Amino acid sequence: MGLLRTIALVILGFSAFIFTVLFGRLPVFRKTPIGLLHRIIWLHIPHGISYIDARLFNGRILRSWGQAGNYILYENHPLVLIFFTTILVIGELIFIPSAWPRISVMHQLYIPIIIALPYYFLYVSVVTKSYITPDNHAEEMKRYPYDKVIFHPGHSCETCHFLKPARSKHCSYCKRCVSRQDHHCIWLTNCVGLNNYHYFLYLLLSLSVMLTYGSWLGYSLLSQTLDRLIPPSSPVRLRKQSWPTFLNMWAAVVAYDTRIGGVTMLMFMTAPLAFAFLVYHVYLIWAGMTTNESAKWSDWKDDITDGMAFKFIGDHKRSDSPLLESAETADSWPGYSDQILVLTEGDPPKEGHQVHKSSNDVIQPTNPDAPIDRRFARVRSMKEIDNIYDLGFWNNLCHVFGNYAAGKAHRA
């Protein structure tokens, strides 16, 4: 029982840490204990170490940390990728030789394919880049329209020295602007973007399948071990078991069949992580947004909750809002909206207000007695806002996998 508890606690702690690192920064966890733990790990602990070092050691610890620390924390290094690959390789080297003589020919045919696919999709996810360069910048500028809600024209990247295309983001780790940037993945040492997002989804799917299949296969082998140690005809197996008896029985099995038992527990407790990440990205596809965009939409949701968002409901032909000024069009993109959304400090826009060209912020007139602009209504729900990048789940899915036919047909 002690061995089983120790293995379970170690794996559970590792899984919880990985879950927090992967999901803690997502908007849905922003005001939850998971988000708090993520901030503690990445913000409060480093700041606390820096504070203690400055007060007690005059900064000597961080100075000795020096270049190595900066490399680990701020550079696009392969250490996490090496760790991830090493865990996969070691787990398979422990599990497969022990399981191979005990499984049928059918499983012996399945296993090489199931373990090879994650490596292939990991490789193509790592080597496939979605960088925006001077050579493809003009094409990227036309790929997506600016929605004037979360992406505005006229913003330049101070590092790459060109206008930022819609849906792009500059990555401080890759030190490049990335087309349709979803997130920077430390497990890949690469940004997940336009060109490798579908490979990333295949990686998550293949990992989920491998871990689920491995968990089931390991359970089957451990059940065989249980039958050898405690035959089904044994009184212990025949009578109703209490939880302590049940756990002690399986602890004995894991202690006896350590290689299969340890790796099976690791697969069983980490499979939900891969599956949860896959489900989350399916949700993003359904919603027509990326991880980066979900954070921007979350900010809008907070602004709506605070009563700061307003929508133009008047005649667009009579509007002089810069948010209606035309920019470069994306001829290949079917989504379009002429909505005008603005943000205030909470008061409705007043007649004579101005709107920043590069944002939705309102500059109220200097006259405090200016009347309210009745052409604007307060936004009460996210349902009132159009997301031009959401073409419906099927078309979004086709776009992710590079099939633009559905999108073009949708536009026609």
Curated annotation (Swiss-Prot):
Keyword hit for Transferase: yes
Bilayer-crossing regions: 3-23, 79-99, 108-128, 199-219, 266-286
Domain annotation DHHC: ranges: 155-205
This protein's UniProt keywords: Acyltransferase, Endoplasmic reticulum, Lipoprotein, Membrane, Palmitate, Transferase, Transmembrane, Transmembrane helix
UniProt cross-references to PROSITE patterns, sorted A to Z: DHHC
Highest taxon in the source lineage: Eukaryota
Domain notes: The DHHC domain is required for palmitoyltransferase activity.
Function: Palmitoyltransferase that targets several endosomal SNAREs. Palmitoylates the SNAREs at cysteine residues close to the cytoplasmic end of their transmembrane domain. May have a role in the cellular quality control of transmembrane domain-containing proteins.
Protein name: Palmitoyltransferase swf1
Record lineage: Eukaryota, Fungi, Dikarya, Ascomycota, Pezizomycotina
Gene: swf1
